């Protein structure tokens, strides 16, 4: 089942005009990449799809469980401690495939930004969401971590939304793209 936005309008408080105006868009199963210049509304659109923001007008039909991985790698996932205690096959597989040590969730604040980002994605995937929304997932990670991340994201079978300036990732992961311009 897709995420469907119908005639959505959104403006931040004190804005002189809406950032998003009368947008209708369907995020189908598979990966949709959001492209556009900085400040054009990609992250805002992703947050609307995730349910972190609500539109002033229009409707959004969301899936039962949507996982959000923010651009800020230092934002610890809500289920981080649950993942730290989990040793089910999926948790073990994600730790192995993303080269995450068992103690890393317990020392999240001391990890590098790249390790934090991998943990954000691992926790999100471990929760088996219907939709996964990622904002700049390859920022702060090295080439090997990027490859690991791509491999686990390619296995995701739900509705995926990817905000990124990483053209190679977009080309390898994206099934479709939505391009945005400011104004």
Where are these regions (language model features)?
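A short, flexible loop at the N-terminus of ABC-type nucleotide-binding domains that lies
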Residues: 1-4, 9-23, 28
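Hydrophobic anchor residue at the start of the ABC signature
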Residues: 121, 138, 149
